[in-house]
Regions:
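N-terminal leader/signal peptides at the extreme start of proteins
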Residues: 1-14
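Compositionally biased linear targeting/interaction segments
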Residues: 16-377
Length: 377
């Protein structure tokens, strides 16, 4: 009997040992699984960070390349016979106005594809190599350069003394009417920028904004980035989309480049003008070499035109780069100012006034996204 009990105890202890081993094995397996899962997640996270960094570096290189192109296309010595025009900001044509006038309206480059072939008489050296080399493996890649002086500068609504500029206010109201928007928006935006707190329209100053659920005040300063007007009363996302191609915010006051301005803007600045006819004439003749040439044109004869508001060159350019690489997207935009060299025999430089990342929800507001969509059709 004693022997049977001893044998039973041995079997019982062996069973406990087996269960303990199985329990330990299960715990080790669970720990290993957890470690492998965590390691796999860390690898994926690291890969995502690397891909994101690669995508952003492609975008940054695109911005730098865009600045190189701006300087090359706006050199005084560039062949003046190579002028090409853009009828409207949204026309998606390839190149802007007269090189001899240092005016660049629009240039769009798609990665991994040959750059545009030079037209007759154009110096081929304006392109840095025949291909954009860094984005050949990108799913989508684009660089967009825009002449910001071909748009209405919102900061022109206010004079240097901080008072509302009535003449520019009327110009902006005519632009709004042409776009079928409420002209009162011009009053609200002007009140947002002017330095005082005296309303020029109903509920256009601090008192109205302080009644909002999230209270805030008017800026009472020049606009740095045009999308700031989303905070202005009456300005919605839809309004922003309509204004996108026609307004900008650059240090003011600034002049409008007649060689890159749209027909809407020109008609607003010269009441009674046939903007489409002027653009056709401008394109056919390779742009205007001087403002006086425009003022002496038969298209402006008998019309009230303030020549001091116009120019035939530009200093401010917005450069946007967009890249989608291996499923990751990135888009950045910079505003560059072309500054002439103070010393002789020195080339002009581009100064970056601001640099900002475009969030994905805002990409739909940029022409960059519209160009990408057009390329995919």
């Amino acid at each position: 009997v004693g022997a049977c009990r001893d044998q039973s105890r041995v079997y019982s202890q062996a069973g406990v040992a087996l269960i303990s081993m199985l329990l330990v094995l299960a715990i080790v397996t669970a720990l290993c699984t957890q470690m492998l899962t965590k390691s796999r997640l860390e690898l994926k996270r690291s890969e995502a960070l690397i891909r994101t960094a690669q995508t952003e570096q492609m975008v940054f290189s695109g911005l730098a390349y865009g600045q190189v192109l701006v300087l090359k296309y706006t050199e005084k010595e560039t062949n003046p016979g190579a002028a090409r025009q853009v009828n409207e900001p949204s026309s998606q044509k390839e190149m802007g106005s007269g090189f001899e006038n240092r005016s660049l309206a629009h240039l769009q480059i798609q990665g991994g594809a040959p750059l545009p072939e030079p037209e007759a008489g154009e110096a081929s050296s304006v392109f840095v190599g025949p291909y954009w080399p860094f984005a050949g493996n990108a799913e989508e890649f684009s660089i967009l350069i825009e002449d910001e002086q071909g748009k209405f500068n919102l900061n022109n609504l206010v004079n240097s003394n901080g008072k509302v500029n009535e003449a520019q206010l009327k110009v902006f109201q005519r632009i709004l009417l042409a776009l079928e928007l409420e002209p009162e928006l011009a009053l609200y935006i002007a009140d947002w920028i002017d330095y005082d707190r005296n309303p020029i329209a109903y509920n256009s100053e601090d008192f109205s904004y302080l009644q909002e659920v999230v209270a805030y005040r008017t800026a009472n300063r020049p606009i740095k980035y045009w999308r700031e007007i989303i905070s202005v009363k009456g300005v919605s996302q839809e309004v922003l989309e309509q204004l996108l191609a026609y307004v900008t915010a650059i240090p003011g006051p600034s002049k409008v480049n007649v060689n890159s301005a749209s027909s809407v803007l020109l008609e607003a600045m010269i009441p009674g003008l046939d903007g489409e006819a002027l653009l056709e004439s401008r394109d056919a003749n390779g742009g205007y070499s001087s403002v006086s040439e425009l003022s002496k044109s038969t298209l402006t004869a008998g019309l009230k035109m303030d020549a001091n508001l116009f120019s035939v060159d530009s200093a401010f350019y917005a450069i946007t780069a967009y890249c989608r690489f291996d499923g990751f997207e990135s888009s950045w935009q910079i505003l560059s100012e072309r500054v002439e060299a103070k010393k002789k025999n020195k080339k002009p430089q581009l100064h970056t006034l601001w640099k900002r990342q475009l969030p994905f929800w805002e990409l739909g507001l940029t022409k960059m996204q519209k160009i990408v969509d057009l390329e995919n059709e």
